[in-house]
């Protein structure tokens, strides 16, 4: 019988919602190959997922496997590796860090019910987005929230491809994209997508000019209520940077830490 790799972590299990829609997942038994041919610039749409953290000989092995499995298929300029642990085990990451890889440490939070955040914004109108102009504003908001380590031109290409995937998924009934508006100006947005009654949040972003007003917490709360009531979920999942304040906002709404997720990625920063 052919060996299969079973993914145990809630974070990575829900990450696979997206390549299952329009990408490819190749199960090699001892690792998974995740591909998004429509968006090769999407680092975490084109990565390898291993069952365990890197061991002492895995630096060279993992790079070789990435080149064979992903680099040979797509025109990529990055490497990305995840491992299916739930307690944040690092393993032998030093050789990767010495070669310029980034270590990503995230907390996976979940909840079955939410509560009104302590800083609730009553000025914003929150609703699912459907119109072309709303989607374009969402794209522009996502680009405005670009991390500074990425070039604007490259990030625009990546983000437009990513948002087109999300739009197609909403059209297929697999989730919802929600915006927070002040009059007709979108100031924050996010997505929630469904698998097996689990709703996974994506790309929670508030425009830099509208932060610290309670908009993020209000948006997540209202989107959570919508997902629990209208799109058939009973569990909500959020993945956040362990060292970023957003996790505290989510906890104020009722999310609780469940797992710790670790990954590594690399790209040529001389091109930024």
Where are these regions (language model features)?
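Short amphipathic alpha-helix that is part of the acyltransferase structural core
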Residues: 1-13, 49, 53-54, 117-162
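N-terminal charged segments
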Residues: 1-76, 87-89, 168
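Conserved active-site alpha-helix within GNAT-family acetyltransferase domains
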Residues: 87-103, 213, 217, 242-260
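Conserved beta-hairpin
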Residues: 24-29, 85, 91-102, 174-188
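Conserved GNAT acetyl-CoA-binding A-motif
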Residues: 73-85, 227-241
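Conserved acetyl-CoA-binding loop-helix of GNAT-fold acetyltransferases
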Residues: 59-67, 203-208, 212-229, 248-252
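A conserved beta-strand-loop-helix scaffold within acyl/acetyltransferase catalytic domains
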Residues: 150, 157-205
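Acyl-donor-binding surface of acyltransferase catalytic domains
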Residues: 58-136, 264-266
């Amino acid at each position: 019988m052919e060996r299969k790799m079973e993914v145990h972590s809630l974070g990575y299990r829900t990450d696979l919602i997206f390549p299952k829609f329009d990408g490819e997942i190749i199960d090699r038994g001892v690792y998974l190959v995740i591909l998004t041919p429509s968006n090769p610039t999407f680092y975490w749409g084109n990565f390898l997922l291993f069952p365990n953290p890197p061991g002492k000989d895995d630096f060279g092995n993992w790079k070789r496997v990435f080149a064979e499995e992903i680099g040979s298929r797509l025109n990529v300029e990055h490497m990305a590796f995840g491992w299916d642990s739930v307690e944040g085990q690092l393993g032998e990451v030093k050789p990767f860090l010495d070669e310029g890889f980034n270590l990503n440490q995230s907390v996976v939070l979940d909840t079955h019910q939410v509560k009104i955040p302590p800083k609730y914004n009553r000025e914003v109108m929150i609703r699912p987005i459907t119109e072309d102009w709303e989607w374009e504003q969402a794209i522009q908001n996502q680009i405005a929230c670009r991390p500074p380590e990425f070039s604007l031109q490259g990030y625009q290409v990546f983000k437009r491809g990513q948002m087109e995937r999300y739009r197609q998924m909403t059209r297929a009934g697999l989730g919802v994209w929600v915006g927070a508006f002040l009059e007709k100006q979108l100031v924050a947005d996010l997505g929630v997508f469904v698998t097996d009654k689990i709703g996974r949040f994506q790309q929670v972003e508030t425009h830099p000019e509208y932060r610290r007003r309670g908009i993020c917490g209000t948006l997540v709360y209202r989107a959570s209520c919508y997902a629990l009531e209208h799109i058939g979920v009973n569990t909500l999942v959020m993945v956040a940077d362990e060292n970023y304040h957003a996790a505290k906002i989510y906890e104020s709404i009722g999310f609780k830490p469940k797992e710790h997720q670790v990954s590594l990625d690399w790209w040529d920063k001389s091109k930024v």
